[in-house]
Amino acid sequence: MEGGNWRPSIFIEAMPLTIILKRRVPGLSERALERFAARACRAVGIEAAVTVLITGSREMRALNSHFLRKNHATDVLSFPAPAFTNGFAGDIAISLDIAARNARLMRHSVSDEIRILTLHGILHLAGYDHESDRGEMAQIELTLRKTLGLPAALIERASGKRQSRSGPLERSRI
């Protein structure tokens, strides 16, 4: 896919989304996050089931340690299913603790930060990888962030295009 040719898809049908809120997100209901995730999935052409887990840093550390052998918490992890196995695109896990800290540093709401991390995770489930794609994921994330009315996205922050005035952000270690 050429970075300059990407446009959000117009896929309309509903796909199953599972939202698991182990922690309550201020200003964001389960239903609102489900609607947002569905819009983001449609925009990148995901027509398969997705699960989004909102949890704490302790569980994120355990997931990161178990699956990636990294013994620290992180803000978002994505676990794509191979080739959308059985109509399932994959899982996304988000740390509410780290999201809240980064939201304070970036001076936007925790609910916006959760949406940013959800979008980032969905892009990974769609097969994008900012570590190796020469900026394609960053461009798509920027376009979708603007389309969806979100503040600076993860890759923009990590690349230094927008810095926090309060110090370093905890970056995604996907």
Feature-to-residue mapping (PLM):
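An acidic/histidine-cluster motif and surrounding catalytic segment
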Residues: 2-114, 123-174
